[in-house]
């Protein structure tokens, strides 16, 4: 990957001049000028996903200039480098190959000259065998009972992805009850364990190093809870499995290393649901559905790797995001799924995007002089409409939004889905086109009120519109289509990081807080007054000590 400051390119300067011409342009004008705008600014993937980006503040010229930026920063070479297994995560000297985990074509992918696919396939086969024994009832707990509940203990990428997918694909789940524990707050593990039976509960401890503070604290509490009933440590092996690479620590914990599922340093945590970290997904949905999830992602991988940029969906969405973030000053993007099963999707890509591209040093180690990753947030529709859409519609912030919905519901109750989708369509229309003062007054006039009668309230009913949105309409949310959708967003994030000249696949920003927490923890063991920090931190620690007793 080349290290090119995007803001110093000719394409960036051209975009800056173009922005001056575009900043006052109305989306409504763009539609008025082009009756086929939808056709010109939308694309379908695999006849399963429609991406409509026509309700954006863009023209053909805008996209041409954004594509010029991608060319000048050598995006195509960056894509090739990732798929070729080059060590593009340079700060950790690692390849970035989550695409290998779902490489259903099984073509060789090399890291340091070694094909990784045999190992990938071996772990998949091991997970298939293990999951089939648990799901089928062959795997027994220490009293001979079959497993009814599975608790995944992890944090960050070892939790967010599997939790999101098992929720999104709940219509496909089997009889096993799936639980996820992440927070080191004892309340999380305590509340999760309350209704469970130690005789029928299986724990998955997801930590590559088997040293992650939050995960191992929860794992030891789960082990203590289990042994409080089981008594004998030899029974731990029947109720715990590990998603890890630290065989020594796994064995010392009491887990049979035959039930340790490995992954590799070229798998980043927030891109790891496709790996052994996805074992909870397999146990919830079955291996066949996990394979379909992989296949959908692989199909998007092929699209991303081989489709020209002008028709490449992750590239298009990435470029539009850069346009708003760097030229319009938009600081956030909202992800708004109109599907209740997808209620964790925004949280998943909050980590996916913000941990990946929340960087302020470029690939040369210099401070950036442009915007990098946006703030990502969102909630399912229609709930959000009754919470924060007010600000999106009439506030002073520009918030580009992704609206996501399936055409087919898994729960076709009465007219629920039609009402849901009518809101989905209405919101993007309202955000784009708004409602003028003239229309407001005309509506009042139709109700028999004069302009003078309503002049005190009319300004508050005006919607400026010109709020940009992307609409992603899926035929149905299935393991395959969800896999493709997740990969779409993953590659969007990669594209933005490549163009913005930052390292997308490290996360050094999480380290300082952990270091300081490890330093502070021993200071909390007694009641002595602390004075080794700044006055604020000292004051907080000392008040905590005074109040905890």
UniProtKB/Swiss-Prot annotation:
It is found in: Cytoplasm. Keywords: Cytoplasm, Gluconeogenesis, Glycolysis, Isomerase. One of its GO terms (biological process) is glycolytic process. This is Glucose-6-phosphate isomerase. HAMAP family: G6P_isomerase. The lineage of its organism: Bacteria, Pseudomonadati, Pseudomonadota, Gammaproteobacteria, Enterobacterales. The active site is at 355 (proton donor), 386, 514. One of its GO terms (cellular component) is cytosol. It holds the Pfam family PGI. GO terms for molecular function: carbohydrate derivative binding; glucose-6-phosphate isomerase activity; monosaccharide binding. Catalyzes the reversible isomerization of glucose-6-phosphate to fructose-6-phosphate. It is an enzyme of class 5 (isomerase). Its main location: cytoplasm. It catalyses: alpha-D-glucose 6-phosphate = beta-D-fructose 6-phosphate. Coiled coil: none annotated. Pathway: Carbohydrate biosynthesis; gluconeogenesis; Carbohydrate degradation; glycolysis; D-glyceraldehyde 3-phosphate and glycerone phosphate from D-glucose: step 2/4. InterPro entries: G6P_Isomerase, G6P_Isomerase_C, Phosphoglucose_isomerase_CS, SIS_dom_sf, SIS_PGI_1, SIS_PGI_2. Its EC number is 5.3.1.9. Belongs to the GPI family.
């Amino acid at each position: 990957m080349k290290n090119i400051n995007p803001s110093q390119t000719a394409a960036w300067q051209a975009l800056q001049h173009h922005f001056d011409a575009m900043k006052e342009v109305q989306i409504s004008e763009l539609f008025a000028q082009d009756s086929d705008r939808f056709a010109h600014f939308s694309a379908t993937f695999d006849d399963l996903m429609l991406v409509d980006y026509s309700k954006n503040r863009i023209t053909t010229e805008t996209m041409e200039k954004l594509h010029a930026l991608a060319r000048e920063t050598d995006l195509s070479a960056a894509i090739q480098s990732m798929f070729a297994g080059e060590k593009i995560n340079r700060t950790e000297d690692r390849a970035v190959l989550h695409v290998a985990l779902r490489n259903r074509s099984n073509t060789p992918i090399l890291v340091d000259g070694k094909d990784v696919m045999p190992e990938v396939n071996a772990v998949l086969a091991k997970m298939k065998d293990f999951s089939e024994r648990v799901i089928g009832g062959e795997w027994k707990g220490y009293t001979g009972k079959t497993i009814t509940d599975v608790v995944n203990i992890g944090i960050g990428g070892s939790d967010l992805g599997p939790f999101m997918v098992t929720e999104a694909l709940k219509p496909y789940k089997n009889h096993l009850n799936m639980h996820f524990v992440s927070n080191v707050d004892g309340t999380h593990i305590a509340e999760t364990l309350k209704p469970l039976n130690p005789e029928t509960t299986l724990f998955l401890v997801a930590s590559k190093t088997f040293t992650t503070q939050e995960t191992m604290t929860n794992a030891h509490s789960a082990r203590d809870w289990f042994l409080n009933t089981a008594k004998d440590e030899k029974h731990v092996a029947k109720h715990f499995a590990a998603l890890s690479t630290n065989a020594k620590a796994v064995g010392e914990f009491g887990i049979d290393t035959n039930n340790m599922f490995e992954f590799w340093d070229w798998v980043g945590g927030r891109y790891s649901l496709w790996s052994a970290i996805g074992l909870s997904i397999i146990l919830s949905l079955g291996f066949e559905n996990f394979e379909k999830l992989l296949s959908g992602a692989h199909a998007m991988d092929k699209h991303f790797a081989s489709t020209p940029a002008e028709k490449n969906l992750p590239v298009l969405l990435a470029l539009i995001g850069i346009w708003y973030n760097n030229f319009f000053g938009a600081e956030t993007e909202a992800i708004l799924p109109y599907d209740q099963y997808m209620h964790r999707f925004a949280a998943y890509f909050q980590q996916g995007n913000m941990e990946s591209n929340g960087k302020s040093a470029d690939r040369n180690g210099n401070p950036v002089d442009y915007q990098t990753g946006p703030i990502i947030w969102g909630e399912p529709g229609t709930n959000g409409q009754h919470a924060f859409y007010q600000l999106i519609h009439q506030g002073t912030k520009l918030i580009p939004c992704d609206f996501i919905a399936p055409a087919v519901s898994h729960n076709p109750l009465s007219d629920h889905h039609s009402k849901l989708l009518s809101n989905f369509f209405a919101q993007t229309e309202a955000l784009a086109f708004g409602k003028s003062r003239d229309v407001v007054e005309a509506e009042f006039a139709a109700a028999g009120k004069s302009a003078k009668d309503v002049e005190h309230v009319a300004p508050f009913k005006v919607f400026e519109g010109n709020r940009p949105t992307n609409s992603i309409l899926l035929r149905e949310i299935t393991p395959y289509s969800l896999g493709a959708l997740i990969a779409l967003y993953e590659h969007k994030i990669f594209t933005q990081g490549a163009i913005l000249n930052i390292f997308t696949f490290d996360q050094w920003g999480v380290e300082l807080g952990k270091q300081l927490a490890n330093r502070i923890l021993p200071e909390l063991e007694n009641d002595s007054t602390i004075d080794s920090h700044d006055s604020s931190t000292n004051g907080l620690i000392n008040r905590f000590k005074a109040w905890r007793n």
